[in-house]
Amino acid sequence: MTQIKDPLNNYIDNPEKGAHDSAQWAGKWTTERYTAKKRANFEAVDSYLSQPVGKLLDIGCGFAHESRCFGEKYGTELWLLDGNQKNNVDKSDTASYGKWNTTTDDLYFYHTFDFLDAKLQELGTKNYHLIDTNNIDIAEDVKFDLITSWLSCGHHYPVKTYIDLMKKHSHKNTRIILDIRCKGTKTNFIGVDGFEIVNVVSDAGGKKRATVEIKLI
């Protein structure tokens, strides 16, 4: 539930604001231009990997555009991890870009899971599990072939936030590909802690970000 502050500075539920914000984000995330960019992301990574993906974890999935492309091409089973609006306070959709947040008070806008699940189904997403970041419930024996995060882990918050999760659900051949924020140049990566850069998959983000393969250490 999206929340606002009352006169005593306490958070109160504001379902109308939440529904309005969800509709605005849905509009942004389903334009032809936006979806074309997401398709290009998939094509770059798919070409780089050059192999089918059986199980995929998408951290900060949103509408899971890239992950859905893997599902369409390979029948990939998807684990889609995202925040639930019911657990987060109201934030402006213009205030979050580039700021790293690691505490509950700093979490940004999310959809409710009911809205997100309905939208994923509307977009034709198949064979997926929607996972709440505040209640991660993935079976111990699930190991992913590919772990991804697009404009989320490594971009809006440090990679180390989910390093333990990545380690827990990786096998010896797991590939991890993330959008990493850069500073000044496309190779001056921010927040490299607990992992190494293996390769730059795409530098389409210019001097602000790059899509990279990483190796956990």
Language model feature labels by segment:
Residues 145-158:
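A short SAM/SAH-binding and catalytic strip from SAM-dependent methyltransferases
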Residues 160-172:
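A short glycine-rich, Lys/Arg-flanked "PGG" loop and its adjoining helix->strand segment in the class I
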Residues 4-49:
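Class I SAM-dependent methyltransferase Rossmann-like catalytic core
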Residues 173-181:
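Conserved beta-strand signature within the Rossmann-like core of class I S-adenosyl-L-methionine
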